[in-house]
Amino acid sequence: MKDTAKHQGLRNQLVTTLEQKGITDRAVLDAIKKIPRHLFLNSSFEDFAYQDKAFPIGAGQTISQPYTVAFQSQLLEVKKDHKILEIGTGSGYQTAVLFMLGAKVYTVERQSELFKTTSNLFPKLNIRPKHVTFGDGYKGLPNFAPFDSIIVTAGAPFIPQPLMAQLKIGGRLVIPLGEDVQIMTLLIRKNETQFEKHEFGEFRFVPLLEDKN
């Protein structure tokens, strides 16, 4: 698993692109500068790994474009040792960004193929999430709640109630809401019953899968 000076140069260019697109969080940009995105992709896409594009990763899923990863990560306002729930491990790239930001990451993946691939990949890259689970993201991880923040990396038609319940007071939930096109939505929990809602424009995500059993 090689990471070369050429890859590093391409990552530096990618970070410049993200800055030009409005990403300002230095810690997020530094994480993206360090993480070998090409190792999270099928080798046939390696030459394109540092373009600001999404790519298929199997099981009908995609690795989000770097801008989207940076945008969601910036909205979370991650602090060191924050306990973060990630719904949709996918390729594991977003997980790696959160880990590099110093978060304790609890991540859930619904697709067994991706779950196996990323579970094998993390140790090779020295990425150490606190907990990697195969399961239904709509349910969250109640046994590990509450969380400082929750990030959903797939489009959802509504905000799953269990996720709202598992957020700490003062916590932030970032979720792309909508059917075909999603509105990036931030919820901040004000108290037991009230949430403050902010919306940040249109994005496109694969749908969040619910366990129908």
Curated annotation (Swiss-Prot):
Keyword tags: Cytoplasm, Methyltransferase, S-adenosyl-L-methionine, Transferase
GO cellular component: cytoplasm
Enzyme Commission number(s) from the entry: 2.1.1.77
GO molecular function, one term: protein-L-isoaspartate (D-aspartate) O-methyltransferase activity
Catalytic site: 64
Record-linked InterPro entries: PCMT, SAM-dependent_MTases_sf
Biological-process GO terms, alphabetical: methylation; protein modification process; protein repair
Function summary: Catalyzes the methyl esterification of L-isoaspartyl residues in peptides and proteins that result from spontaneous decomposition of normal L-aspartyl and L-asparaginyl residues. It plays a role in the repair and/or degradation of damaged proteins.
Listed name of the protein: Protein-L-isoaspartate O-methyltransferase
Species, as recorded: Flavobacterium johnsoniae (strain ATCC 17061 / DSM 2064 / JCM 8514 / BCRC 14874 / CCUG 350202 / NBRC 14942 / NCIMB 11054 / UW101) (Cytophaga johnsonae)
Gene symbol of the encoding locus: pcm
